[in-house]
Amino acid sequence: MAKLHDYYRDQVVSELKNKFGYKSVMQVPRIEKITLNMGVGEALTDKKLLDNAVADLAAISGQKPLVTKARKSVAGFKIRQGYPIGCKVTLRGERMWEFFERLITIAVPRIRDFRGLSAKSFDGRGNYSMGVREQIIFPEIDYDKVDRVRGLDITITTTAKNDEEGQALLAAFNFPFRK
């Protein structure tokens, strides 16, 4: 069991239930899934770059990524429909909690010139999205074996009904929001 999952059940649920006046514990917002996405536009010219991105994402998440393909052709970007242009992973359950714990405690503090994450990155329905400029902030990535520094998108999907509830949920886990 991940420590944050136990912490959520033991303390965060009762804290949020009192704060927002929920009648049932099932109304309390929870983290549903965490999606990691890595776009590799350069994969059009060099297929090896996509393989390296897949390997990096697999190391970070502990799960085999799905290779994403272009939905439609765009002449300006020189891509055709069906070309592999990135990879993504959806984490749920135990792996999600373990990743979330590593993200907060290990990875985010290793970001260069870190001053906190923006609280404006909520989508209006309590889901939070953030971008990471370099994958080397994760301890699973061996710095010497990295061929190219890549960024990735991290989306935390919650059952919160609005941004206020979503922010309260993440703040209860000591999520490092900018003051």
Curated annotation (Swiss-Prot):
Q: Does the keyword rRNA-binding apply?
A: yes
Q: Which GO terms describe its biological process?
A: translation
Q: Which UniProt keywords apply?
A: Ribonucleoprotein, Ribosomal protein, RNA-binding, rRNA-binding, tRNA-binding
Self-association or partners: how does it assemble? Part of the 50S ribosomal subunit; part of the 5S rRNA/L5/L18/L25 subcomplex. Contacts the 5S rRNA and the P site tRNA. Forms a bridge to the 30S subunit in the 70S ribosome.
Name of protein: Large ribosomal subunit protein uL5
Q: Which NCBIfam families match?
A: PRK00010.1 (NF000585)
Function, in words: This is one of the proteins that bind and probably mediate the attachment of the 5S RNA into the large ribosomal subunit, where it forms part of the central protuberance. In the 70S ribosome it contacts protein S13 of the 30S subunit (bridge B1b), connecting the 2 subunits; this bridge is implicated in subunit movement. Contacts the P site tRNA; the 5S rRNA and some of its associated proteins might help stabilize positioning of ribosome-bound tRNAs.
| Family label | Belongs to the universal ribosomal protein uL5 family.
Q: Which PROSITE patterns match?
A: RIBOSOMAL_L5
Query: Matching InterPro entries, A to Z?
Result: Ribosomal_uL5, Ribosomal_uL5_bac-type, Ribosomal_uL5_C, Ribosomal_uL5_CS, Ribosomal_uL5_dom_sf, Ribosomal_uL5_N
A single GO cellular-component term from the record reads: cytosolic large ribosomal subunit
Gene coding for it? rplE
Q: Which Pfam families match?
A: Ribosomal_L5, Ribosomal_L5_C
Q: Which domain of life is it from?
A: Bacteria
Query: Which molecular function GO terms apply here?
Result: RNA binding; rRNA binding; structural constituent of ribosome; tRNA binding
